[in-house]
Amino acid sequence: DLSQEDDRTRDRYGRNTWGQQLLMARRLIEAGVDVLTTSLRGPLCGRVQNWDDHAVTHHVFDALKFRARAYDQAVSALIEDIHERGLNERVLVVVTGEFGRTPKISYQPSTGEGNASAPAGTRQPGRDHWPRAYSNIWAGGGLETGRFIGATDARGEDSIERICGPGDFLATIYHHLGIDSANVRACERERYASQRLSENE
């Protein structure tokens, strides 16, 4: 019940769907929920209500401007709030998508008008799917924070330093949950081989 939160806290997260979603997430964590997933989608994303920023969907730069304030406010409020409440050892916050976006901007005719999209037929910039390099945000969970891990080449096309894959991503979460990733199996057939990120790296 978000009405139990004071106005200052609700304003801090943002009086919009994303802000109130992440405030609810914090409340559920305080109530004892161990694993929680929330998705920042819907009207705050733009015309098609997701982050699929192909040129036919969104004007990628307008879409980022359209989302940035609500995203930054909600995510930073959650991370700060977790630290201020002393939950930063117990709670691991991971903000990610499923892949990156092409470093090279593509141009295609827009398929429709609306938030973060040009009128139908107007050529607009976009970015397509790109699995070779992307980033995520990690906070809390007892991790050493305030740093970057890894790097891409100058064009942002490929990871060139401290390359981590999905196995590393999952193994780090498993480690936080007290699960030995060496014993995790996918589909009960193949061993899910990965190493967690070292606590000191």
Per-region residue spans from a language model:
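Ligand-binding pockets and gating/stacking loops
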Residues: D1-E201
